[in-house]
Each structure stands twice: as C-alpha cells, then as structure tokens.
C-alpha cells in the first residue's frame, strides 16, 4: 500500500506530464509557485485542501483522482 503523500505526488506528476505541462505552467494555472509544485512532487511539502482543489482544476481532473492508487502512473 502506497502512503498518501507518495500517491498524491506520483499522481500530480503523472497528470501534469499527461497534459504536457511544465511545473511552471501547472503552477500558473493553479495560482501557485513553481517551487511549491516541485516540492509537492518530491514529497517535501504537505498540501491544503484548497490547493488540492486548485491543482485538480488546473489539471482538468477531480480531486479524488490525485489520491487513487494503481492508475497508469508509470511515467
């Protein structure tokens, strides 16, 4: 079983790359800073529910999808 932070970080990166977004572009769309997205993907930051929603909206997905294990997340 994957821990929640690892699952979230893996899925953010997967969906970001699937959309062909850079960390900077995702950050702009979500109204966040690029270093924050980078830290999330490296599991160095915790995240608020508000920012989960902002990232999901920027990626065009539902927030719950960022916590689903076993998606095609091998990037």
Language-model segments: which ranges?
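Residues within helix-turn-helix
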Residues: 24, 35, 53
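Short, basic-rich loop-to-helix N-cap that marks the start of a DNA-contacting helix
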Residues: 44-54
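Short basic helix-loop element that most often maps to the first helix and adjoining turn
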Residues: 10-25, 29
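Recognition helix of helix-turn-helix/homeodomain-like DNA-binding domains
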Residues: 32-46
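Conserved hydrophobic/aromatic packing and binding residues within compact polymer-binding modules
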Residues: 12, 26-27, 37-40, 66
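Hydrophobic micro-packing sites on short alpha-helices
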Residues: 52-56, 66-67
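Short, charged recognition helix plus adjacent turn
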Residues: 65-75
């Amino acid at each position: 079983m994957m821990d929640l932070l690892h699952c979230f970080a893996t899925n953010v990166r997967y969906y970001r790359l699937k959309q062909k977004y850079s960390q900077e572009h995702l950050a702009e769309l979500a109204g966040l800073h690029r270093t924050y997205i980078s830290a999330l993907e490296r599991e160095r930051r915790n995240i608020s529910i508000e920012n989960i929603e902002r990232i999901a909206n920027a990626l065009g997905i539902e927030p719950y999808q960022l916590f689903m294990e076993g998606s095609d997340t091998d990037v």
